[in-house]
Amino acid sequence: MYKKSTLAVLIALLTGAASAHAQTDLSTIEARLVALEKRLQEAENRAQTAENRAESAEKKVQQLTTQQQKNQDTTQEVVQRTAKLEKKADEKSGFEFHGYARSGVIMNDSAASTKSGAYMTPAGETGGAIGRLGNQADTYVEMNLEHKQTLDNGATTRFKVMVADGQTNYNDWTASTSDLNVRQAFVELGNQPAFEGPFKGSTLWAGKRFDRDNFDIHWIDSDVVFLAGTGGGIYDVRWNDSIRSNFSLYGRNFGDIADSSNSVQNYIVSMNNFIGPVQVMVSGMRAKDNDERQDTNGNPVKGDAANTGTHALLGLHNDTFYGLREGTSKTALLYGHGLGAEVKGIGSDGALRSGANTWRFASYGTTPLSKNWFIAPAILAQSSKDRYAEGDSYQWATLNMRLIQEINQNFALAYEGSYQYMDLKPEGYNDRHAVNGSFYKLTFAPTFKVGSIGDFFSRPEIRLYTSWMDWSKKLNNYASDDALGSSGFKSGGEWSFGMQMETWF
């Protein structure tokens, strides 16, 4: 009996212990689950926080990227605006450098010095030039510095200074014989907005200058008309679309400017009109007491010198070869009286008589003859009477022709023929004698260029040349101090050889 009770008690105890142990395990599991859930929630919270931070960081990065792009765009805009402003500034203001130069060496057929120059004949004293090709031994340089600007209101300004020098010495150091000189220094004011009507678009100027509308025959080194000095004026007063006028006042000095007592000045008033291709120019001048002018020793210079003068020019500027074919041509007829009888250099000769009269005719043209041949004929003729002495007469005419034969794009053969006839009767003025006769010159010049071979106005050029010239024997007797008839340079034929460069830009 006892054994059965004991067994029952043991079974009951074991059963209770197992139940208690089971309850304990469930509680632990539940606690662990709660803790795990809590940790999961905390992890989710941390993940959400990290995600929020990541999104915030991404937004900041995006904002920074956007701002950086904006900054780059702004920088690019600034760069572009700056470039535009700099370009605009460059277009509105700037310096320019231009120039002309020629330099060469010449000798005769004995390898000795010889005479040369476009004005070497007796007619040259009154402007009778001959062909210059193979006939110049000087070094002449012009250097032009300009500053131009355009203001915001559309007005323009221009300052120009020209320095020039002429030299016949072949040495590299020639300061002691230099003719270095400031030939131009002037200012122009253009397109002034306050100007209206005919003056709209005109240009005011003042200073020392060559007149803008001078023109020349380059191949004989002669201006057709040359107005220069110190003064002021206005260009391009437009009356309508085809008519414009220039008005100017120039001053010049006569005599030795080193003489402080020399106060004779020539004042030139000029009106230059352009009607389409036609030019009509009229000038008047006055030099008070020119007939009483004295030299540095106090002696009268010329008691019959003129005090006043007039000058006129009628010109035609064509963009064809005399209306016949392609090319260019210019023609002019000039007349001068008194001080105006120096018709080329207006107002530059103070020795002219009050009764002096001069007529001049000038014409030249350029045209291609074929693909490889080009021609430039020119004529210059003048008749002047009562010029320096009563009853005197200076008549001459020059015919010149230059041909270019293109060999290739960098090499050409140039040919020039020049003929001049003169009949000079100076009536003893300046110990000159009456002569008449002819002068001839032929030149052959192989020429190197970088391009535009057939363009007569394209430079630079380097030339080799040989020239032959001859003249009537009577011309040797014109004067004792001129070229023709001088020692070793008399009629009968003269050869010369040399080389020369010429450039302009």
Model region roles, listed by residue range:
Residues 110-133, 171-183, 194-304, 482-487:
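Surface-exposed coil loops of outer-membrane beta-barrel proteins
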Residues 157-159, 201-202, 245, 327-329, ...:
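Residue-level recognition of the N-termini of beta-strands and the immediately preceding loop/turn
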Residues 23-196, 204, 237-240, 272, ...:
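Beta-barrel outer-membrane channel/assembly domains of diderm bacteria
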Residues 237, 242-246, 262-263, 272-450, ...:
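Detector for outer-membrane/organellar transmembrane beta-barrel domains
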Residues 434-486:
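C-terminal structured domain segments
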Residues 141, 181-183, 202, 228-230, ...:
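Residues that flank catalytic or metal-binding motifs in active/ligand-binding sites
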Residues 1-24, 40:
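Gram-negative bacterial Sec-dependent N-terminal signal peptides
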Residues 105-113, 151, 167-171, 193-195, ...:
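Gram-negative outer-membrane beta-barrel proteins
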